[in-house]
Structures are given as structure tokens and as C-alpha cells.
Amino acid sequence: MSVTSDTATGTGFTAAYAWTAEVDEAPVSVSAAGDLVAVAGAGGTVRVLHAAAGAPVDVFPLSEGLLHAALSPDAQHLVVAGPGGHALWRRADRRVRRALTGERSQAAAWSGTDRVAVAAGRRAVVLRPDGTHVWTTGPGAGAVTGVAWMRGGRWLAVAAYGEVRRHERHPAAPVATYPHTGSRLALALAPTGRWICSGNRDVPLRVWRTRDGDRLALSDAPEKVSRLVFDDTGRWLAADGTPHVTVWDFSGDGPAGSRPRTLLAPAAVTALAWRPGTRAHLASGGDDGTLCLWRAAAGRAGGSLRPAHRYALGAPVVALAWSGPGLLVAATREGRIAALRLPDGTRL
């Protein structure tokens, strides 16, 4: 892997790349936390880098390949998941604990720094950072495709074919089930714990209110949503699934009866990531290699927005991750990792 630095010229201003790197396999997932960035490659190589300069910290393999990576919030641990199982990495001594069970694992989510939920076939397993087992959900109807924590780690949402299940530690059976049709492609939970949202292959965007399990009727809901993410405040939800991106306002009683803002992306969207903070700044990547930055809450409901800034990365963007509000890390299908440093930490 080689690391260099240069500048990126976009519409509106010129921003410096903190660093760029080239890797020899296609990235599939990028995670950033604290002073680290983790890059998971399709061939099974995990690279842990310093966020500030891109210098390597560690490299290790997962023999069955990779689908997902997630750093703990304190950047002291990393979980990676793939077709044959998962692995946990510890920063203090670079120790890797592999659990190659043969069960497909394509999702993981941390609850604080002391617990991580990992998809394991038709179940989700909750572990300590050292790999110690805490509890396991009961099996669902199909393979688990998404996991997310709610209510400060008291609830765990697990998505699979035909349903999203909400679990508490005891019993292993779900305390609530939110049914849908077909395969789930994306799962997002509001930080407030009020909403569960699901993107699906066969039906439009689904939204449930956790208090009573009611499903909201949405106007202009996109179909085939595969990327779905709330901002830090829980007010704004971004979804792909159309030629563009829709942004939904979850303030008050939620988005039922309202229309979303439409972000006019220049090409099919392949990655979405909210900038940390409360200003509703969104980054999107496209299959034409374009990286866009958006003021996603500008204008009015039902209106259309164009990018505030655009950058050309030269190959389809496969993953985005923010390392704080001032550094955006993007990965392309051809193996380029680019860390873009924005000139101001709060404005866009």
C-alpha cells in the first residue's frame, strides 16, 4: 500500500487531501472512529490506518473474505464480518480472535465500547470486545442482514427476510416484530429510539413507530432502498432507491403526509454518510466516481437540491466514512482510499 497527499478541486472551493492510498483489492467497507480508519477488502485483507496521515497500523486477513467492518467508538477494537464468520481485533496488542463458524456474517454494530452485535446466520450474537459471549437472539426466518442498537443498548433490532425483530436480552425471542415483504437491503434506527426504518428489494421504504408498532404511510417513498441512514440528531433520514437521494424530516410526529427533499445526484448513488454534528451535511458517492457534499436540510419539503460541492475520484465510490466533522474518507472500487480534509469543521 502506498500513501501520498495532493489536492482535490471541487465546485466551490479547493480542499486538501489529508492523504490518499492505493490498495491491491477492491474495498467493501470503511469504518472510522477516534484516530483510526479501517478498510475491509473483498479478498479478505483488513487494513487499519491512522486517520490523520494514512500510515498503516496493522494488516491482517480473514480467509473467507469480508463484507463489513466496524470500529468501536473508542477505536480500541474492530469487528470484521464475512461469508464464513467474523473476527475481533484488539489495538493494544494487535491480537485477532477469529470465529470462522461457516455462518454468513454481513453486519455488526457496537453498543458503546463494551458490547458488539454480530450477524451469525439466522441469529445475532452479542459479544464482549474480547470475544466473550453475552447472549444470542433466537433464529429468524432467514439470514440476518442488519443489526442496530436502540435505547442506549437496551434494545437490539435485527433485520432478515420478511421482518425486522426487536430484542431485549431476555428472552431470546423478540419482544416486537415488524413484518415486511421480501429481502431487506437496509436498516436504520433513529438515535431517539422512536423509529425503525427498512429498505427492501420488493417494496418501498418502510417506517414503523416503536411505541405502538404502527407503520407510517409515506408519500413518494422510494423503492429498492439499499442505503438508509439517520443523522446524529435523528431528525433527518437519507435514502437511495431512486435515481436520486430522498431526505425525510422526522421531527414532530414524523414524515407521514409530508414530502421529502430530493437531492439531484449526478449518477446512481453507491454510498451515503452524514457529517457528524447537527447541521444536516451529507456526503454521497456515485458509480461515476463523483463524491458530492450536500446541505441536505436546505430549501423546503418537496423541493430539489443540487450538490454544494463535487469531486471526481476517478472510479465508482463503494464506501464513505467520516473521521470527525473535518475528515471524510472515501474508497473506490479500484482500490483508492482518499481522505478529504474540509477547510472548515462546521460550514459547507
Model-predicted segments: where are they?
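Residue-level detector of Asp-centered blade-edge/turn motifs that repeat once per structural unit
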Residues: A32-G34, P73-D74, S111-G112, R151-G152, ...
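Hydrophobic beta-strand positions that form the internal "hydrophobic ladder"
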Residues: V37, L78, V116-A117, L156, ...
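Conserved strand-to-loop turn within each blade of WD40 beta-propeller repeats
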Residues: A40-G43, A81-P83, A119-G121, A159-Y161, ...
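WD40-repeat beta-propellers
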Residues: V46-L49, A87-R90, V125-R128, R165-E168, ...
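Blade-level signature of beta-propeller repeat domains, shared across WD40, Kelch, NHL, RCC1
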Residues: V318-L348
